[in-house]
Amino acid sequence: SLTVQPHLRGERIADVGSGAGFPGIPLAIVEPQRHFSLIESTGKKCRFLEHVRDELQLKNVEVVQSRAENYRPEVRFDTVVARAVGPLAGLLKAAGALVVGGGRLLAMKGRYPQDELAARLNGWKVAAVHRLSVPGLDEERHLVELCRSHDRVG
């Protein structure tokens, strides 16, 4: 979960489809100066996330029970992170509106997602694809960094 840490931008981070809190909870622990919103649609998982947040006394974590496509925060996020939430096109449709102009959407993937990268991304472009090294794991992991088509890459 911490392999994405070097790629975070800004103060406001969203973890979409947070599930059991990965990568949001570990990132919030090591990045106390940033605010994390854990967005999860399942009530039972949200109650678990709230319990973990309270037990760890993470003042920088907000748990939001909502589907990403239905959530409209007052202020959009500098970085939106998603792990295991399906194809890039669907992720962009569901969570793209949560990203502030100039922000990034980081999609954690397994094998290099060649087919997904070749698909139309409707107003988005690939800023970078980072190969991730996960200690103790020999399998491929990649982080796809997306930005709006009109944003500068860099």
Describe these PLM feature segments:
Residues 1, 16, 41-42:
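Generic detector of well-ordered alpha-helical packing
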Residues 1-11:
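Conserved alpha-helix/loop element of class I SAM-dependent methyltransferases that forms part
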Residues 31-153:
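S-adenosylmethionine
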Residues 10-19:
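Conserved class I S-adenosyl-L-methionine
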Residues 21-25:
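Glycine-rich SAM-binding Motif I of class I
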Residues 3, 26-29:
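Active-site signature of alpha/beta-hydrolase-fold catalytic machinery across serine-
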Residues 18-20, 87-88:
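Short, composition-biased local secondary-structure segments
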